[in-house]
UniProtKB/Swiss-Prot annotation:
Cofactor: [4Fe-4S] cluster
Record region (Disordered): 1-22
Biological process (GO), any one: terpenoid biosynthetic process
Entry protein name: 4-hydroxy-3-methylbut-2-en-1-yl diphosphate synthase (ferredoxin)
Lineage: Bacteria, Bacillati, Cyanobacteriota, Cyanophyceae, Synechococcales
Task of the protein: Converts 2C-methyl-D-erythritol 2,4-cyclodiphosphate (ME-2,4cPP) into 1-hydroxy-2-methyl-2-(E)-butenyl 4-diphosphate.
Gene: ispG
GO molecular function: 4 iron, 4 sulfur cluster binding; 4-hydroxy-3-methylbut-2-en-1-yl diphosphate synthase activity (ferredoxin); iron ion binding
Positions annotated to bind [4Fe-4S] cluster: 314, 317, 348, 355
Provenance organism: Synechococcus sp. (strain JA-3-3Ab) (Cyanobacteria bacterium Yellowstone A-Prime)
Listed EC numbers: 1.17.7.1
Keywords assigned: 4Fe-4S, Iron, Iron-sulfur, Isoprene biosynthesis, Metal-binding, Oxidoreductase
The keyword Protein transport is assigned to this record: no
InterPro entries assigned: Dihydropteroate_synth-like_sf, IspG_bac, IspG_bac-typ, NO2/SO3_Rdtase_4Fe4S_sf
Classification via NCBIfam families: ispG_gcpE (TIGR00612), PRK00366.1 (NF001540)
Amino acid sequence: MQTLDRPNAPSQQPYPEPVYPRRPTRTVAVGNVLIGSQHPVVVQSMINEDTLDIDAAVAAIRRLHEAGSEIVRVTVPSMAHAKAMEAIRSKLIQTYKPVPLVADVHHNGIKIALEVAQYVDKVRINPGLFVLEKPQPGRTEYTQAELEAIRNKIRETFTPLVQTLKAQNKALRIGVNHGSLAERMLFMYGDTPEGMVESALEYAEICAEQDFHNVVLSFKASRPQVMLAAYRLAARRFDALGLNYPFHLGVTEAGDGEYGRIKSAVGIGTLLAEGIGDTIRVSLTEAPEKEIPVAYGILQALNLRKTMVEYVACPSCGRTLFNLEEVLQKVRAATQHLVGLDIAVMGCIVNGPGEMADADYGYVGKTPGYISLYRGKEEVKKVPESEGVQALIELIKADGRWVDPPEGSPSN
């Protein structure tokens, strides 16, 4: 009888190496936060208060930072808003702590950007709007001379900002939006990912000419398939040119509720799974603080950052020996503060032990009225279902992995 060769010994690592290794990038510092492939993926968001309202802006920045936004962006549409950033930064330091801040600058914004650069850690510009080209209805072509004149105007306008940021050791985001490409980009490339990439490249090459590389790039669109194509193309194009700048990921105008979260998870999560992306912002039409758990959830699902307990639970079926949904909620309520643990709650022994083999602890339906507790793959004890949650807590305590929940937490 023919026999098969013995397979290689299984890896001892609980998780396989990613199919796509992370895209190598430079490191860019935004205040005390480092963005790039050698560092954890950074979560950020943006306040929606008017920057001229100093107290409201400071409170909003603090709320976001406390919620887990490691970098906070503010809109700076005028010179008055730019000057207000000095007071905002000062009050943050006095009443809270320094927070890495990004100023969002758009239409013909060079004077605003130069002013605000001294008060923030990063300036974000939109290439489609920074040197605004007045559209000409009925235009049928751009001459080479016209294109060269626009490029020269961009270089002349943009270079002082690059030099200022370089001198101050600040960062820049070249943030392209699919919905605001310049007219000539639309004329040459259409409303396409190619136009988005070329729009960013035009500005990035000026940065490289000035030997300024504290640059982050983004290529956002409201449709995940467009942003996916743009980021993939950008990774190939920029890396081929040696401009391996970090990428800021996001689906802009994702909407609200469940569908907004799904769109963000599809767009951001797909790229992260491919090794593309170094900082993320989930954009929801909701209070900005609600974006943060979604962002960390995406990172946890991909095993990129662990900020909560990982619960493994089956969907339930006719073999389930207890109310799985109810028990999962009880287990979660008792253990959700034990960040770093993987806990499985499985309804029966058919798939339970195998499906939860890489969990730290398992709670599995054994026979009617009884459950088994596991430590990894090892069955530790069988207890009445009514004692299951407390027995799980005692097992975790016996292993020295229990900590008391913080005061006021749901686990307390």
